[in-house]
């Protein structure tokens, strides 16, 4: 008989818990992984690896010399729990966690737009 996993309340506005249940220990909703630090929004650039996506985060940087803003972007590796399904081009919310591997320090919390 499978046990029912309790969904944690992350108290993040605009992010709903997923409907699927997973047994991933690195899931912020059903596992033991804590979300702390920054929350970012970005577009999924690559979703080819198993349980990992590359998210492109675009932000504005102020250039003091020219008194203008320039658009910069960075690619962030994020863990993808089994209970959340994404495709390339989806807008997702990611949260900072403890390091999961050498390059993965964020996890996907939810999908904003498909």
Curated annotation (Swiss-Prot):
One of its GO terms (biological process) is translation. It holds the Pfam family Ribosomal_S17. The keyword RNA-binding applies. The keyword Ribosomal protein applies. CDD domains: Ribosomal_uS17. One of its GO terms (molecular function) is rRNA binding. Transmembrane segments: none annotated. One of its GO terms (cellular component) is cytosolic small ribosomal subunit. InterPro entries: NA-bd_OB-fold, Ribosomal_uS17, Ribosomal_uS17_arc/euk, Ribosomal_uS17_archaeal. HAMAP family: Ribosomal_uS17_A (MF_01345_A). Belongs to the universal ribosomal protein uS17 family. This is Small ribosomal subunit protein uS17. It comes from Aeropyrum pernix (strain ATCC 700893 / DSM 11879 / JCM 9820 / NBRC 100138 / K1). The lineage of its organism: Archaea, Thermoproteota, Thermoprotei, Desulfurococcales, Desulfurococcaceae. The gene is rps17.
